[in-house]
Amino acid sequence: EATRSGLLRALKVWLPQAVQPDKTDLYVFYAGHGMASDDGESAYIVPYGADTFLLEDTAISRERFYEEIGAAKPRTATFFFDNCYAGTTRSEERLLAQRPLSIRVQESPVPDNYLIFTAGESNQTAGVLDEVKHGRFSYFVFKGLEGEADANQDGKISAGELHQYVRESVGRFSAGAQTPTMLGDGNRWVLK
């Protein structure tokens, strides 16, 4: 169950045992809810059972998530976040009715060995492809990693190739309402 304590247990107990410091290339995939603080200073992963009025106490800030992973010392860490921080569900329901309609999260710098793919801009909703019952972002990440993103047909997929494929595909299927983002080195190999 993806509760706050379950996620923290995975980050603090399981992950350090699974990672060989400075040798492991870590891949993290999260699909679920996210929410920004009212001032846009912090973005939170909102696990099962979280109270949206008490984000600091019941959710996990993205910064803490990165710090916990950094403590395990992977050689590289690649993140795929199929969530949004707009405070809406995929059916456009508001998680917290009295929140402003649009909050833009202020991006924090990330370590050089991190590569972060997100489902959309911080004030956008991460939508679903109904016909496959997956988030648009997840679906096109999977298709991209299966080879669709290999633009130059060299049998390897760079972060830049994957991002371009996912961004164009999601943009097309969302009529431009969802724009996936990437932070990090676009020349780094995601799959080789």
Predicted regions: what they are:
Residues 149-192:
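Caspase-like cysteine protease fold
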Residues 54, 117, 124-128, 151, ...:
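Short, solvent-exposed loop/turn elements at domain surfaces
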Residues 51, 122-123, 147:
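Active-site/binding-pocket entry motifs
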Residues 4-31, 35-92, 161:
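Caspase-like (clan CD) cysteine peptidase catalytic core
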Residues 77-138:
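Extracellular S/T/G-rich loop segment that most often corresponds to the catalytic His/Ser-adjacent loop
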Residues 12-20, 70-74, 142, 146-150, ...:
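Sec-exported extracytoplasmic/periplasmic mature domains
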Residues 1-2, 157:
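Short beta->alpha linker loops
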